Amino acid sequence: MMYKVIKRDGAVTDFNIAKISSAISKAFDALNKETHPTVIDLLALKVTSDFEGKIKDGLIAVEDIQDSVESVLSQAGYADVAKAYILYRKQREKVRNMKSTILDYKELVDSYVKVSDWRVKENSTVTYSVGGLILSNSGAITANYWLSEVYDEEIANAHRNGDIHLHDLSMLTGYCAGWSLKQLIQEGLGGVPGKITSSPASHLATLCNQMVNFLGIMQNEWAGAQAFSSFDTYLAPFVKADNLSYREVKKCIESFIFGVNTPSRWGTQAPFSNITLDWTVPNDLAELNAIVGGKEMPFKYKDCKKEMDMVNKAFIETMIEGDANGRGFQYPIPTYSITRDFDWSDTENNRLLFEMTAKYGTPYFSNYINSDMEPSDIRSMCCRLRLDLRELRKKSGGFFGSGESTGSIGVVTINMPRIAYLAEDEADFYRRLDKLMDISARSLSVKRTVITKLLNEGLYPYTRRYLGTFENHFSTIGLIGMNEVGLNAKWLRADMTHEKTQQFTKEVLDHMRERLSDYQEEYGDLYNLEATPAESTTYRFAKHYVAQFPDIITAAKDGGTPYYTNSSHLPVSFSEDIFEALDIQDDLQTRYTSGTVFHAFLGEKLPDWTSTASLVRKIAENYKLPYYTISPTYSVCKDHGYIAGEHFTCPECGGQTEVYSRITGYYRPVQNWNDGKAQEFKDRTVYNLGASHLKNERTVSHTAEDGKHKETPKASNGARVMLFTTKTCPNCKIAYTLLDKANIGYEKIDAEAQEDLTMKYGIRQAPTLIVTDGDGYESFVNLSNIKKFIEQC
């Protein structure tokens, strides 16, 4: 039987029995033990017999061969030679490890300067520049450190061989983080020894400057996106306090937007920033006194709706206008909340919002109508209770963003097509998947331990000052290429457009969720399942395995650059009918707990704002998926500005243009994409609304938020009032003070210690106030609703 050997670096070579004979001879020589060559050859033959059962698909791993050498030598009575062989293996391993930690500085610099390495375009946000060169050099050293000094050989080899992808190896940091804008407003910027400290901002212009600096500082301590929540709600009181004109507000917002798009971050990049905008004042903030200059104002957030509209108008107008050349702003990526009380009428801000969406595809939309998310989730992570260690929480804050005081310490993506290609059947597929999930979970636990130690030692001074802990940050496991799983799996042989592959994908996602619950119990950390954006991983995996297994099926057409389809998405050339794609994706995307989004790729901008608003509304009201975008393609000419659609040359002057499309979650010029993603763009079929048909359309009536107009009961003399708190909740202390000041008698309940009461009343977060008369009870969740209860008593 002819078979091949998989080397440690993943390369495949022809089997050569002479190499086994040579290794055995060296073990005998090490003991000065003479033996006839025929004995050596006989032992080598026995080795081939020993590992025969480990050969799969004509392939055998070099480690399996070496294990068999040890076994055969021991069984043949050469225990001393077996020991010498083990020492020989360890010595070879040390030499390999030494080589892996030595970088060729000339190759390192030349590969970047000459753009000979595909990783120069690994991240489309990094411009070819001296800053990019510095990032490339330091990143290579840091990645080597992770793989050679931190992770064990099993984890490092799984990454090197392309079984998994350990994201952000170039950074000795966590992945992404959401920050409390309220905390910045209350405490100001600083508090780090030896660094300048600024008092809480008293004016909008000052706050905008502090936000730009804050995001830039934090970006240097994290690898990925930095996020603020409730941007419009928290900024509105500054407009009200100073009675600012619209012109003054717009100047402030312009300075913020231009500031966060300045390439001030490592690698000559702008800080990867995300903001969420509430559009209407959220219920959990409405009754709270607004904060300006670090102090409470004599008015509440609900009193600032007019000013909130001014902030939103200024933000959208600036984003629509673009820069001096008509180029759309890359950051911040805005996420808008679509709730049941979203006003779809013809208002100035609605026209602007959906014009921006149609022209640049800028915003993400959070679906709070049909998804299982709540608008307050984005601000309540640090107050959520963890009574059930198996409960998988949703990571809030949008596709790239994160809710307040939460985020992810790291991401590992599993190469699903490779598992399918090697698996004999479904049972073998799950065995292989479980092993890689175990390795991934362990790698994330190792990373959490390392960066937590570094946090405590002061390596991330501003993160330590404003966050202090990674306890509310997730360990993220993602996947890629379920479409190609269907094509490569012997029991499927069908892509994601076929029902049997869709059903298998649902079963796989459910299986992965169950194992993540196991890891939460085992490690005591939060785990989440992500539809990985995989900007470069899609290309790295496919490129690596096409070289190793030429017959593996990728998403590329014959002769095209190989790539894998993101997560469990449909083939990019599937259909012009957007609703046909949504019908399939809806049941898949809702199985993830983060990072899942549906991109409505359009050839060019929709004709008017009403058609855009109609599409956004139809998706929210008819589907359960949590996040989505409207993503038109557009071009920019340096002389003639914005051009709708894909035009690599300007229709006016014939000059070269920049063509912009969404690469994974953000807009970048197609010319900057890596080869795999560029091939995906070529293969993509854009949606045509004229050819799209929504079946069984439903419309959700415009209603007020649940509970907004309920009459709040008063605490009668016979009522029992209980305040459920936790030791770490920052709002619980404020709730005590308000209740004491109002002379309302209450019992303080430790929600984590008194689980029976917590479960009885369905407490999910702190603070929560329960008022009961024995027959029934009323629940007041969050500080805003508790304050409203107190005022009406």
Region locations from a protein language model:
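Local sequence-structure signature of Cys/Sec-based thiol-disulfide redox active-site neighborhoods
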Residues: 711-742
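Thiol-based oxidoreductase modules, predominantly thioredoxin-like and allied folds used
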Residues: 744-756
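Core structural elements
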Residues: 68-74, 278-279, 461-485
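Conserved catalytic cores of very large enzyme subunits
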Residues: 91-95, 101-471, 492, 498-652, ...
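Non-catalytic, surface beta->alpha helical segment in thiol-disulfide oxidoreductase systems
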Residues: 772-793
